[in-house]
Amino acid sequence: MGDWLLRRRGLALLLVLTLLLNLGALGLEYLADMPPCPLCWVQRGVFGLMSLVALVGLVYFPRGWGRWPLAGALGLSALTGVIIALRHLYIQANPDAVSCGMSPEVLAQFLPWWEVLLEILSGTTDCTQVDAVLGVPLPGWTLVGYLALGALGLYAVLARRA
């Protein structure tokens, strides 16, 4: 029973931390005047997805083989976040790699959603602006967050009983 409770607390901690990270992003946006670029919005969405997966894990909390789909969803969402954060860091390090484009709102009016997503993931000139906290660019912090929270989530779901 103690091991089950410990793993459940890990998922609860994952849920709280991902929600706090998104709340912190809103604080940076409105209080520190750091408007998000399209890739920042996608990264917030990935943290939201991790929150949703953690909530499903808390409510359903599968055992045995049932925990593997939950671990897969957590791992896949964390990996997606890592890839997007690395892409964002690449764009910030190489601002010439992106070109000026239309805003996602305008694209959404004319293109199918998957093409809009591909355009967002390719980056815009808005994504080249480097906003840093404690000297580290924000995508660097999100990269650390995805790695740490992905590891926490996988440990909470897959840890073996002692």
UniProtKB/Swiss-Prot annotation:
By its UniProt entry, which Pfam families does this protein fall under? Answer: DsbB
UniProt-annotated location(s): Cell inner membrane
Q: Does the keyword rRNA-binding apply?
A: no
Q: Which cysteines are joined by disulfide bonds?
A: C37-C40, C100-C127
Where exactly are the transmembrane stretches of this chain?
Answer: 11-27, 46-62, 69-86, 141-159
Determine the domain of life of the protein's source: Bacteria
Q: Which residues lie on this side of the membrane: Cytoplasmic?
A: 1-10, 63-68, 160-162
One annotated Gene Ontology cellular component of this protein: plasma membrane
The membrane topology term of the UniProt record is: Multi-pass membrane protein
**GO BP terms in the entry:** protein folding
Which UniProt keywords are listed? Cell inner membrane, Cell membrane, Chaperone, Disulfide bond, Electron transport, Membrane, Oxidoreductase, Redox-active center, Transmembrane, Transmembrane helix, Transport
Q: What ranges are annotated Periplasmic (topological domains)?
A: 28-45, 87-140
Q: Name one GO molecular function term.
A: protein-disulfide reductase activity
- Briefly state the protein's biological role: Required for disulfide bond formation in some periplasmic proteins. Acts by oxidizing the DsbA protein.
Give the matching PANTHER family.
Answer: DISULFIDE BOND FORMATION PROTEIN B
The similarity annotation says: Belongs to the DsbB family.
- What protein does this entry describe? Disulfide bond formation protein B
